[in-house]
Design a protein with these regions (language model features):
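Residues on the lipid-exposed face of transmembrane beta-strands in outer-membrane beta-barrel proteins
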Residues: 48-52, 82-86, 117-121, 147-151, ...
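Residues that define the transmembrane beta-barrel architecture of outer-membrane proteins
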Residues: 40-46, 76-80, 110-115, 124, ...
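Short glycine/proline- and aromatic-enriched beta-strand/turn motifs that initiate or cap beta-hairpins
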Residues: 19-71, 91, 157, 294-301
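Repeated loop/turn-to-beta-strand initiation elements of outer-membrane beta-barrel proteins
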Residues: 23-25, 55-61, 89-96, 123-130, ...
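Detector for outer-membrane/organellar transmembrane beta-barrel domains
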Residues: 125, 129, 142-227
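Gram-negative bacterial Sec-dependent N-terminal signal peptides
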Residues: 1-20
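Outer-membrane beta-barrel pore domains and translocons
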Residues: 28-34, 62-66, 97-101, 122, ...
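Flexible, glycine-rich linker and terminal segments associated
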Residues: 21-26, 170, 194-198, 219, ...
Length: 301
């Protein structure tokens, strides 16, 4: 938790001091209530990220915090990332980042540290990035390897695919995971489609919104998860948003999750701040795993 607070403060100070060099900044604070068979779970979610450029150097920071209130028992999850990149030769960029995962469940805490280095090529249309991440000892894995390919159709639309391999500790079985994403961020509508495959698990998620007026709009989401070709989770949601100011809006969504015949109803209310997003070129493996897995598994609180 200390690292979480320090990193949030650093990102805040940095983005204020270097506002003229800000390349992107976004944040979200949402509250979700889930009700299934009389059991209620409340979820508080916070995410903030920012990046800024200083010449050929770019710096970035990301903070994610999720709190689950399970009938009085709390489960806290946090992710903090700090990193820097260096662009050279017109088309090339190298980067290094540090990420810490922390969890505190039912009074028991644990953390995992990940250090990643990457090298990428981007000519404005096509990009490729390779990365290696070292995981701390006793995390269950030694390393995470990744290769990302991307295509930038225009300034608002991009597509990417990536392949990741998690190398297990002590001769355990390695795991492979693939991600495919399509994103469109326009003035009238936004659309995100994500697919994740990992051994016998397949998930797909669709999230979008449409602006009816300059202030009001509708939004919706779909997600499906299958294991061994058996459908184990379906999620459908619909709602709306109100644009308070440029880049700042309030979202509200009601949704239903069907898992093996058991229904869970939920409602989410959130405040979003969006001044651009991190480009695919600058996404770390952790970025891709967090965003694609959350959206495709219907965990977009």
């Amino acid at each position: 938790m200390r690292l979480l607070m320090v990193s949030a403060a650093l990102v805040s100070v940095a983005t204020g001091a270097y506002a003229q060099n800000l390349s992107y900044a976004n944040g979200e604070l949402s509250f979700t209530s889930l009700d299934g068979d009389g059991d209620t779970t409340d979820v508080t979610y916070f995410e903030g990220s920012a990046g800024f450029d200083v010449g050929a150097v770019d710096l970035f920071g990301d903070v994610i915090f999720t709190e689950f209130d399970l009938s009085g028992d709390d489960v806290d999850l946090s992710t903090v990332s700090l990193g820097a990149g260096y662009s050279f030769g017109g088309w090339y960029r190298t980067d290094v980042s540090y990420t810490q995962f922390e969890n505190d469940a039912f009074g028991f805490g644990d953390s995992t540290d990940v250090t990643e280095v990457g090298l990428g090529f981007n000519d404005g249309l096509f990009l490729v990035r390779g990365a290696y991440a070292a995981l701390e000892e006793d995390s269950g894995a030694d390393a995470l390897y990744g290769l990302t390919l991307g295509l930038q159709f225009n300034e608002n639309t991009d597509a990417s695919v990536s392949r990741h391999r998690l190398e297990a500790e002590d001769g355990g079985e390695d795991e492979n995971l693939s991600i495919a994403s399509l994103n469109h961020n326009g003035d009238i509508f936004e659309l995100e489609i994500d697919m994740v495959t990992a051994d016998d698990v397949f998930s797909v998620g669709l999230n979008g919104n449409y602006a009816i007026t300059s202030r009001f709009g509708v939004l919706g989401s779909l997600a499906q998860v299958s294991i061994d070709d058996d459908d184990v989770l379906d999620r459908i949601g619909a709602g709306g948003f109100y644009q308070i100011a440029d880049g700042l809006r309030i979202d509200a969504e009601i949704f239903r999750i069907d898992s093996d015949g058991d229904d869970v109803d939920g409602i989410t209310v959130g405040l979003r701040y969006d001044m651009g997003a991190k480009s695919v070129e600058r996404e770390t493996q952790i970025d891709r795993l967090n965003s694609a897995v959350n959206r495709s598994f219907g965990l977009n609180f």
